[in-house]
Design a protein with these regions (language model features):
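A structural motif shared across PLP-dependent enzymes of the aminotransferase-like
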Residues: 43-56, 229
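Local beta-strand N-terminus motif with an aromatic residue
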Residues: 37, 61, 94, 140, ...
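Glycine-rich beta-strand-centered segment in the early N-terminal region that forms part
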Residues: 2-46
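Glycine-rich cofactor phosphate-binding loops and adjacent beta1-alpha1 units
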Residues: 132, 137-138, 142-219
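Short, well-ordered loop/turn sites that connect or cap secondary structure elements
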Residues: 33-34, 91, 182
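Mid-domain Rossmann-like dinucleotide-binding core that forms the NAD(H)/NADP(H) cofactor-binding site
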Residues: 71-149
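Hydrophobic beta-strand signal
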Residues: 40-41, 98, 189
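C-terminal hydrophobic helical "lid"/dimerization subdomain
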Residues: 227-283
Length: 283
């Protein structure tokens, strides 16, 4: 969202409000569709107040789930996981699904959706605490600590015949490790590349010929392409939340708008566990 390069959205300009997903309360409305007190989500950015058109907002139903869930599992994060896995990854029951950034906002949901679908799941995360979270709290079959283990060897240990779906949130060396361990017909979902966003030289996959040898494919996905189907995903995932099949963990930081830069940087150090949310405290 900030890189001055061709992308799926224009970069944020200098002196423009920093783009971000928001959960807000309506304090005044001239629209018959929204009233004072309604909770809404949108992309109003890092600011305390915003003027918005009703068509750019989505009303939140607190009776369906805790409002914070609309920034995570029932928001863009959940939509990314749902459509990335099911529409691009095309998992089949008993497939081996490997997820990088698995303790992050999208990754943890992808793994749980794969389990609901009957897949074997392997999560890649950094540190013992995150790996224990994956296996002990949200049901991944195996976890790999990229900080202390050889990722390629560990994937091979848990997926003897190779992986069937790799959901990539990280890029770089971990993507390389996945490419070394593809099953025939594997699908790689390119969702993000957090390891590459701040580098001066982006590391591309050197062993891409593995796609040829294994008749595999690698495809990028942008969640906005599925906007007309968000309702489908929200309905299904809200049901799984109520049934206890799906869990959502948010890492909520309470502070002011001025705390955003420090909070944002947690994403790049791996300090967050789950969806990172800055909750603006009332003055």
């Amino acid at each position: 969202w900030m890189n001055d390069a061709r992308s799926y959205v224009p970069p944020v300009r200098i002196n423009q409000v920093m783009r971000a997903l928001t959960l807000s309360r309506v304090i005044e409305s001239k629209s018959p569709d929204l009233k004072e007190g309604d909770l809404v989500t949108g992309t109003q950015g890092i600011q305390e107040y915003a003027v918005a058109k009703p068509e750019d907002l989505n009303r939140v139903d607190p009776a369906l789930a805790d409002p914070s869930r609309y920034l995570s599992v029932l928001g863009m994060t959940g939509m990314t996981a749902y459509f990335g896995l099911f529409d691009v990854g095309l998992p089949k029951p008993d497939d081996v699904v490997v997820v990088s950034g698995a303790a992050g906002a999208v990754g943890q949901i992808v793994g749980q959706l794969a389990k609901i679908h009957g897949c074997k799941t392997i999560g890649i995360a950094g540190g013992e605490e995150k790996c224990k979270f994956l296996t002990d709290e949200i049901g991944f079959d195996h976890a790999i600590d990229y900080k202390s283990q050889n990722v390629a060897k560990e994937i091979r240990r848990y997926a003897k015949k190779g992986l069937d779906v790799y959901f990539d949130n990280v890029g770089g060396e971990i993507l390389e490790a996945a490419l070394f361990n593809l099953n025939r017909g594997a699908r790689i979902v390119i969702c993000g590349a957090i390891s590459q966003y701040n580098t001066t030289a982006v590391q591309g996959p050197r062993n891409y010929l593995s796609l040829l040898v294994n008749r595999a494919r690698m495809e990028g996905m942008v969640v906005f392409d599925y906007a007309e189907r968000y309702g489908e995903a929200v309905e299904k995932m809200a049901g799984w939340l109520k049934e206890g099949k799906l869990k959502s963990k948010e890492d909520i930081v309470k502070g002011r708008v001025t705390d955003f830069p420090e909070t944002f940087l947690k994403l790049f150090s791996g300090a967050n566990l789950g969806k990172l949310i800055l909750e603006i405290e009332k003055v």
